[in-house]
Structure formats: C-alpha cells, structure tokens
Amino acid sequence: MSPSAKYVQLDLNSPEFQQSWFELEADDAERVRAALKKILKLTWQDVYKDKGLHWEKIQSIQPPTGVDALYTFRLSKSARAVGYRHGNYLRVLLVSADHDGAYGKK
C-alpha cells in the first residue's frame, strides 16, 4: 500500500470533542461512533471523495497556528464534526448536533 493509501487514523483526545460527544443523545452518539469506525476503514482519498461525509474546508474560521485548515464533515444526519488532517491522523476537535454549531455560527 502506498503512503497516500494508508488508512486514516483518528485522534479523539480533544477535551472539546469528548465533552460534545458525551452530551449527544444516545442514538446520535451511537451514529457518531459508527461513522468514526467507518472512517478507520478509509484512506484519505476515500475521505475526500465520500459523498456521505461531505468533507469541506471551513472558510469562516481561522485555523490554529500550525494547522493549514479546519474541515467539517458529516458523522450522522444531525451531527457534523470539525477537525483537521495531521499526517495520517484525523484530529477531531468537536462534534455538534447543530450543523451551524460546527461552523462556529451558534
């Protein structure tokens, strides 16, 4: 497998992500878990192309120092997440059941 075809690894250690995930209703939290499990079976090229994830760059938020860009992606019908790529890791910063909340418009 070429380096660009390696499976995505997840970093779910952000306290904001953990807090927001734990605050979801049980059904939403389970759908998020299933989506994250799916992402582990994808390459980065798969993530970029996956119609269900709707991976898109966030233009309205300045990324933290050292991060090229922040992205939002769908984890369920009602939940989106914010994160960024760091090497082969997807560092997930938060999950929001309110789509506008994922874009910082709350």
Set out the residue ranges of the language-model regions.
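Basic, Lys/Arg-enriched alpha-helical interface segments
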Residues: 1-79, 85-106
